[in-house]
Amino acid sequence: MEQTRKAAAGVTNPRYANGTLRRRNRARLRAMGGPCGICGGRLGPIHYDEPSDAAHPLSFVVDEIRPVARWRQFGYDSPRAAAEDFNNLQAAHYFCNQRKGAKTQM
């Protein structure tokens, strides 16, 4: 019910406001095949072919270097601008990203 009210009020998750760009950025990071931007690969390589969930802690997720939740603090015009800025994105392990939360560093 709460989700319905938020959607009706026009409040959406900025990460998914432009799904095409989000998928393109995700594919670009996947193609780059880099190490985890959070741990630097200390936990091992990112498993790019596994589902991104708790059962696969080394799986690939897109991490926002500067958290979207703190967009004003980092000088973005909107949460959507922070979520869509490729320079604000990095590949990460699912585990590392969950541990980092809305912080800029671990």
Residue map of PLM features:
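Short intrinsically disordered terminal tails
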Residues: 1, 105-106
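Short, charged surface segments at domain edges that flank catalytic/cofactor-binding sites
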Residues: 2-51, 80-83
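Residue-level detector of intrinsically disordered/flexible regions characterized by low predicted structural confidence
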Residues: 8, 102-105
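Cys/His/Pro-rich metal-binding microdomains
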Residues: 37, 90, 94
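Short Cys/His-rich local motifs and their 1-3 flanking residues in nucleic-acid-associated proteins
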Residues: 41, 94, 98
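Histidine-centered nuclease catalytic patch
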Residues: 43-91
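Short, non-ligating residues that shape and space the ligands of small metal-coordination modules
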Residues: 45-46, 99-103
